């Protein structure tokens, strides 16, 4: 093993404890978490077993972080906890969502998509879909003011990265004539579904493709008697709400707070927890600093994209 490989191995280590895949990351502060926790069907009901196994390790990780899941919104365990937030649509019937939860302006956006010729349907994961996703990925190097990390990925990579959890996945395609112009992938997790990815061509943004995809997702969830459709977080750290939060609100997503537990396993972990060093920069930096920094990044990346298109 080279020195560089050894350094990488200390930054991330994966193994199983019982039925849960655990990943440990970090060098100065080693944090253990359940890998892909939001997408797993099982939730932690006996954290003491995982904690004792982690403490037996040499060296032991400094902190263990795990979360509860919908619909369990009240803390169950006697550990230090914070609240993470989700963007979720409570679902009863499609008609109830359409008439009572959705704002009139957003209903008009779904109608606008229909008038523009956009149709939506559940589709299979196959080579045709992979090629369509690749075309959407490669349209632009910048999305929502940040560098788009899927840009210029090759077909095998696109196929591999979108083939996760296929036994519990549903793909919805948005079509203009016969062309795929947008897609949504959601994963069924217990009694709710979680949006893993939703994306459409920027050149068709005047056709409300994303609104149409979400409407179809609600319809599918309602037909399966699911209780929630979850779309990532409602807000992120001290950045607060942004344009994406507003989009989610207009589509009837609400903020739901879920307990997240932060368990120190070492003296270093206890000190780090006291100093809140387990948090991300957007949780630590004040909003008055985060917002202008993000705005500067958006302007720079937009300028970069403009120069790239002109070249």
Task: Provide a role label for each language-model segment.
Residues 25-45:
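STAS-typified acidic loop motif
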Residues 1-32, 68-82, 92-206, 215, ...:
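A conserved beta-strand-loop-helix scaffold within acyl/acetyltransferase catalytic domains
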Residues 48-59, 212-228:
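Conserved acyl-CoA
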Residues 40-44, 201-211:
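Conserved glycine-rich acetyl-CoA-binding loop
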Residues 61-63, 192, 228:
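Residues at the N-termini of beta-strands
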Residues 1-30, 77-96, 227-311:
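Active-site/acyl-donor-binding loops of N-acyltransferases
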Residues 63-68, 197, 230-233:
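Short beta-strand segments
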Residues 47-85:
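Non-catalytic accessory segments adjacent to catalytic cores
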């Amino acid at each position: 093993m080279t020195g560089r490989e050894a350094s990488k191995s200390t930054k991330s280590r994966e193994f199983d404890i019982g039925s849960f895949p655990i990943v440990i990351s970090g060098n100065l502060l080693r944090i253990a978490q359940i890998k892909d926790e939001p997408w797993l069907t099982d939730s932690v009901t006996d954290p003491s077993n995982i904690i004792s196994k982690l403490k037996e390790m040499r060296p032991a990780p400094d902190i263990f972080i795990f979360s509860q899941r919908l619909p369990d919104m009240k803390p169950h365990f006697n550990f230090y906890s914070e609240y993470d937030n989700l963007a979720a649509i409570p679902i009863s019937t499609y008609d109830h969502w359409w008439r009572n939860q959705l704002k009139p302006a957003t209903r008009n956006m779904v109608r606008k998509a229909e008038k523009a010729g956009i149709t939506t349907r559940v589709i299979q994961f196959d080579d045709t879909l992979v090629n369509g996703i690749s075309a959407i990925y490669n349209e632009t190097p910048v999305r929502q003011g940040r560098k788009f990390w899927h840009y210029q990925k090759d077909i095998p990579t696109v196929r591999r990265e979108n083939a996760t959890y296929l036994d519990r996945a549903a793909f919805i395609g948005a079509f203009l004539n016969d062309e795929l112009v947008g897609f949504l992938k959601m994963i069924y997790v217990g009694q709710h579904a979680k949006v893993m990815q939703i994306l459409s061509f920027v050149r068709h943004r005047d056709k409300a493709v994303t609104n149409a995809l979400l409407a179809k997702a609600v319809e599918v969830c309602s037909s399966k008697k699911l209780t929630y459709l979850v779309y990532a977080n409602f807000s992120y750290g001290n950045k607060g709400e942004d344009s994406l939060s507003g989009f989610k609100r207009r589509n009837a997503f609400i903020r739901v707070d879920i307990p997240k537990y932060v368990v120190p396993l070492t003296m270093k972990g206890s000190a780090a927890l006291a100093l809140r060093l387990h948090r991300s920069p957007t949780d630590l930096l004040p909003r008055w600093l985060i917002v202008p920094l993000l705005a500067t990044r958006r302007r720079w990346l937009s300028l970069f994209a403009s120069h790239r298109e002109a070249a």
